Amino acid sequence: MFRRILVPIDLSERNAPALKVSLALGRVARAKVTLFHVVQQVPGLAAGEMRDFYDRLLTVSRQTLGRTAKAFTAKGIAVRCEVCVGEPAREIVRAAVRSRADVIVMGSHRVDPKRRFAALGTTSYKVGILCRCPILLVK
């Protein structure tokens, strides 16, 4: 069964279904849940070049994750929050390895079938290719 659940979220309303599923799964499995957010690094700029900008984004992200975590603690689920700066798919995989996640629960949005190879660029697709643990995609 799943003992450690990683839940990468982008702090939008689109995460509600994945949060709902991870809350239920965490409660049933008595799992430890890690809520994880990646502040996407601006390509071509090192994190040090925009330190104040990233610091503000990290602070707001931690506050938002903290509010989200309250729903888990209210149900008796052990939850922790992590935030970092980087490329989302790569950082999600690193977090999964670091936390020894048994499963990743993440949202997936609809891809326009008219756009060739559109799905190849999605974060969930990249995580699926790079990660060794199971991934539960929630729509």
Segments the model singles out, each with a brief description of its role:
Residues M106-I129:
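Glycine-rich, Arg-bearing micro-motifs that act as flexible, cationic patches
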Residues T34, R80, L136:
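Conserved beta-strand positions in the Rossmann-like core of class I SAM-dependent methyltransferases
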Residues G128, C133-V138:
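Short, flexible loop segments at boundaries between secondary-structure elements
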Residues R3-G48:
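Small/aliphatic-rich secondary-structure junction motif
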Residues K70-I104:
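Structural beta-alpha unit
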